[in-house]
Regions:
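Cysteine-centered catalytic environments shared across enzyme families
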Residues: 1-195
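Short, surface-exposed acidic
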Residues: 341-353
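Small/polar glycine-rich anion-binding or flexible loop at a beta-alpha turn
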Residues: 352-360
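ATP-dependent adenylate-handling active sites, centered on carboxylate activation for C-N bond formation
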Residues: 125-327, 331-341, 359, 363-367, ...
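Short glycine/proline-enriched turn or capping motifs at secondary-structure junctions
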Residues: 86-90, 374-382
Length: 391
């Protein structure tokens, strides 16, 4: 028997069907947890579940979820509950020793059940864009507005979400940052209720400690992304909202990165086509989710990512290369699709990565140098973060 509290973001029946059919995109926004004696995590890792290496291998009861009873904890949604946590890889099923319901799934140990589809490209460009439009519209509309706020940078991704929900918009950045300026402009264009957090050095120092504790990561890129996410989520929670909608995933799915546009010349990708480079970046999403979900949840709110619903993923994967990148334009199909409700000024706007658009990366560098960690040192921001947090 699978309890409702044992599985996040999907029904047990849906996950059972996905396992039986080998269906990687069964119509969910991701899932993770325990089903029929086995831990599961969706193909893109949009939810998190952890197993305790020693307890699971030692034969503790598979039902011993952290906090559930007095026995050894085998698994949890929170790695802090476990003595030796290991994140279940995306697309994997891991039967747990000692649970009769999992005996027919083989010996304990994770096995990959789902892989990201690689369909042939849609040859009808109009149909491809229409499919993206319908998928995004439905996925955003079904989010609902109860307890909802939107993380808003003023770019096409967050505006595609914000323009279709009745919820306040939140942005964090240093005064003069790209994100504050763009958010003000886009919020005015959609008549949105924008709430700004002007970040200070004290905010960074406080948030760094929180995100390192939550994520265990200290490198400059991960901290630079997690800090503004945490600060937005913290403000959202303080204002009484418990869900935070993000435009996460559009860059990875729709060809938003320069390295994808420059494939195969860009050394940051191994792929030899734009479509293959897009797939390569999409396969990196699970690692990002662990960072982002843990940082946002540490602030007390639940992240919602409608642009990563299975129906959007399926529509994106069917796009031909020319609807990902065309000349200097990126996310071609996505921009065309959401122009139905996104103002042109936002639909056409180039996006800066969160750590740069908020100026958090610049100010982390400044704080590190002020604290004696000079750029000539290898990885000076990481060293500063580790000194600040005793990591």
């Amino acid at each position: 028997m699978t309890l409702e509290t044992d599985l996040r973001a999907a029904s047990a029946a849906t996950v059972r069907g996905a396992i039986e059919r080998g269906d990687p995109l069964p119509g969910t926004a991701g899932f993770a947890g325990l089903v029929d004696g086995a831990l599961v995590r969706d193909v893109l890792g949009r939810e998190l579940v952890y197993v305790d290496r020693e307890a699971a291998d030692g034969g503790a009861s598979a039902g011993a979820r952290a906090g559930a009873n007095g026995s050894a904890s085998v698994w949890s949604f929170d790695p802090g509950d476990l003595a030796d946590p290991e994140l279940l890889p995306a697309g994997n099923v891991r039967p747990l020793r000692g649970d009769p319901a999992g005996e027919d799934r083989g010996e304990p140990g994770a096995r990959q059940v789902w892989t990201l589809p690689d369909p042939a490209p849609e040859t009808d460009e109009g149909a491809a864009v229409a499919a993206v439009r319908a998928a995004v519209r439905e996925s955003v509309d079904e989010v609902g507005s109860t307890g909802l706020a939107v993380a808003f940078s003023g770019g096409v991704d967050s505006t595609a979400v914000a323009a279709r929900v009745d919820a306040p918009l939140y942005v964090a950045g240093f005064e003069g940052s790209h994100d504050l300026t763009a958010a003000r402009s886009a919020a005015a264009a959609i008549d949105g209720d924008l709430r700004e957090t002007e970040v200070t050095h004290a905010d960074i120092e406080r948030a760094v400690e929180a995100v390192v504790a939550a994520t265990g990561r200290t490198n400059a890129m991960d901290v630079g992304i997690a800090v503004p996410l945490y600060l937005v989520a913290e403000r959202v929670a303080a204002d009484g909202y418990d869900r935070l909608a993000l435009g996460q995933g559009a860059d990875e799915l729709f060809g938003g990165y320069a390295k994808v546009a420059r494939a195969p010349e860009d050394p940051r990708v191994e792929a030899d086509t734009v479509r293959a480079a897009r797939r390569e970046t999409a396969l990196g999403l699970p690692d990002q989710f662990e960072r982002d979900l843990r940082a946002i949840r540490a602030a007390g709110v639940e992240p919602v990512a409608p642009l990563l619903h299975d129906r959007v993923v399926r529509a994106a994967l069917a796009l031909p290369g020319e609807l990902l990148v065309a000349g200097e334009g990126r996310k071609v199909a996505f921009r065309r699709a959401v122009r139905a409700w996104v103002p042109e000024s936002a639909a056409a706007r180039d996006k800066k990565a969160l750590q740069y658009g908020s100026l958090v990366a610049r100010e982390l560098d400044r704080l590190a140098r002020q604290d004696g960690f000079k750029r000539r040192l290898n990885d000076h921001v990481r060293k500063y973060v580790e000194a600040l947090t005793d990591a």
